Amino acid sequence: MGLKEEFEEHAEKVNTLTELPSNEDLLILYGLYKQAKFGPVDTSRPGMFSMKERAKWDAWKAVEGKSSEEAMNDYITKVKQLLEVAASKAST
């Protein structure tokens, strides 16, 4: 399985989490996903009254130095971590 296929698979797996990840984890995933799929952020930063959109933009901007492949690998690693945490909580 190639990197792109594994990335797409983990993008689907994240939807199977039984517990919603923290906002911090969600923003990390968002930034990595956008960087992997679209490359560096290409829009202006949302205004201060659009707090949710601004946080998402900041998360994407934070990873703009990563290549698409690096972002895919980091995304896969993060999803695996979240799945492991969910599995350990389910077994206790």
UniProtKB/Swiss-Prot annotation:
Tell me, what's a Pfam family for it?
A: ACBP
Q: Which GO terms describe its cellular component?
A: cytosol; nucleus; plasma membrane
| Cellular localisation | Cytoplasm; Cell membrane
> Which molecular-function annotation in GO is an example for this chain?
phosphatidylcholine binding
Q: Which gene encodes it?
A: ACBP6
Organs and tissues of expression: Mostly expressed in seeds, stems, and siliques, and, to a lower extent, in leaves, flowers, and roots (at protein level). Highly expressed in root and shoot phloem companion cells.
Q: What is the phylogenetic placement of the source species in the record?
A: Eukaryota, Viridiplantae, Streptophyta, Embryophyta, Tracheophyta
Stored Gene3D superfamilies: 1.20.80.10
Question: What name has this protein been given in UniProt?
Answer: Acyl-CoA-binding domain-containing protein 6
- Give the organism, scientific name: Arabidopsis thaliana
Q: Which UniProt keywords apply?
A: Cell membrane, Cytoplasm, Lipid-binding, Membrane, Transport
InterPro entries the UniProt entry points to: Acyl-CoA-binding_protein, Acyl-CoA-binding_sf, FERM/acyl-CoA-bd_prot_sf
The residues that hold an acyl-CoA are 30-34, 52, 56, 75
One BP term from GO: lipid transport
What is known about what this protein does? Binds medium- and long-chain acyl-CoA esters with very high affinity. May function as an intracellular carrier of acyl-CoA esters. Confers resistance to cold and freezing. Interacts with phosphatidylcholine and derivatives, but not phosphatidic acid and lysophosphatidylcholine. May be involved in phospholipid metabolism.
Q: Domain named ACB: which ranges? A: 3-88
Conditions for induction: Up-regulated in constant darkness and down-regulated in the light. Induced by cold (at protein level).
Q: Which family does it belong to?
A: Belongs to the ACBP family.
Give the superkingdom in one word: Eukaryota
**Summary of the knockout phenotype:** Enhanced sensitivity to freezing stress.
The UniProt subunit note reads as follows: Interacts with PDLP8.
